[in-house]
Amino acid sequence: MEEIQRYFQLERSHQHDFLYPLIFQEYIYTFAHDRGCNRSILSENPCYENKSSLLIVKRLITRMCQQNHFLISSNDFNQNPFWGRNKNFDFQIISEGFALIVEIPFSLRLRASLEEKKIVTFQNLRSIQAIFPFLEDSFSHLNFVLDISIPHSIHLEILVQTLRYWVKDASSLHLLRFFLNEYCNSNSLITPKKVSSSFSKRNQRFFLFLYNSHVCEYESIFVFLRKQSSHLRSTSSGLLLERIYFYAKMERLVNLFVKVKDFQVNLWLVKEPCMHYVRYQRKSILASKGVSLLINKWKSYLVAFWQWHFSMWFHPRRISINQLSNHSLEFLGYLSSVRMNPSVVRSQILENSFLINNALKKFDTLVPINPLIASLAKAKFCNVLGHPISKPVWADFSDLNIIDRFGHISRNISHYYSGSSXKNSLYRIKYILRLSCARTLARKHKSTVRVFLKRLGSELLEEFLMSEEDVLSLTFPKASSTFWGVYRSRIWYLDIISINDLANHKSKF
């Protein structure tokens, strides 16, 4: 963002955010395209997209300057000369630039707010790297958890109205409304499932911007309740945009609840001295140490709030109440639960000895093996039963390239689940990838797996058998003698880039 600000300066006033002229600047689309290519660590190699031609951008800007497309109705969309022959590609270019432009006032306001009030950070707003240690330290002391599936169905006009509080440029909002109504059905709801694949894949930045603005609006309820009770700890993570939005929400009084009748009178129904809120992408959890009556009141309150504020139906089954001692919580790719760890302590006083049975709560994290195998089967590494198969599409690559692709996926999965309580299930994943790699190489050389391994030796695939302590010793060679004791405890080896794919098992490898 600092690089972009070298080219232009915007007024930092809340009333003068004139973003519309930036849409006609060529360098905006250059920056947007350079930052828009997302790569997946789970993929065999980075994602390389065809860069948009500068000539195409110039022609598109020329059409934008010549046509007053805001006066054209949606019925004339197909005859609109503003769009070129490939209107989807034109929409992709403009949406990338528009998503980058709208983020500018958020960044400027955050920086101005931090400079004026000398605020470095807010201690309860943490990054994705802090979620796992947070769960490990806090969940063993809690009883109930609300497993919330964030409502993502929202009318297009509500999205535009939400952005009005932040983007004061009416022309930019009209352009946003024009895009949404032309690309989607204006009478439908915008949901990740209903949006076409070209919209979700080619316009990820634009789509995430709209979704994050909606999510941060619903999170304002927790900001308000935190002002009422200083013990509400929140952990939220995602794109820079939602972090900026959350900081700004913390610094201004949320008067959203003034219209709710007798809200202050009924606030004590949901006040609780120890609440923990964690969110990642479309899923959030609200954990409490209180009784079941309190957590049920929280559920009823959240359902009523979303239905009233967003004018939409919110099914109560989107929020499930689970007791941590009896149910496993699926979050960030892990199956988490709190189990009792029994221990026997012998106490002796003079000639009398006693055996004291003591049970301690322990935060337990398991690897969801079945969803992982399903993802491997979808990526054609094995069948639905988990039996390894060859990867024919990789048979044309070199031997070292094939081994590197399989090893890359195996290392990422092993590193991500290094904090699991039991890693035995990971050996099955490594076995599938190892044998799939061997069968792919054997297919390439028109041989069998046994003959191929016998000829080249099993050392060819030794990286699949490398244990986690070996990886740590290679990463930190000077302290390798101390890793055996450390390895017995959890080691959260996280990658902020690949976590999006590993936290969602349905993603492609």
Curated annotation (Swiss-Prot):
- Family note: Belongs to the intron maturase 2 family. MatK subfamily.
Single Gene Ontology BP annotation: tRNA processing
Which spans are transmembrane here? none
Q: What does this protein do?
A: Usually encoded in the trnK tRNA gene intron. Probably assists in splicing its own and other chloroplast group II introns.
Native organism: Otacanthus azureus
Protein known as: Maturase K
* Record HAMAP family: MatK
* InterPro entries referenced in this protein's UniProt entry, alphabetically: Domain_X, Maturase_MatK, Maturase_MatK_N
This entry's Gene Ontology molecular function terms read: RNA binding
Q: Which UniProt keywords apply?
A: Chloroplast, mRNA processing, Plastid, RNA-binding, tRNA processing
Q: Write out the annotated subcellular location.
A: Plastid, Chloroplast
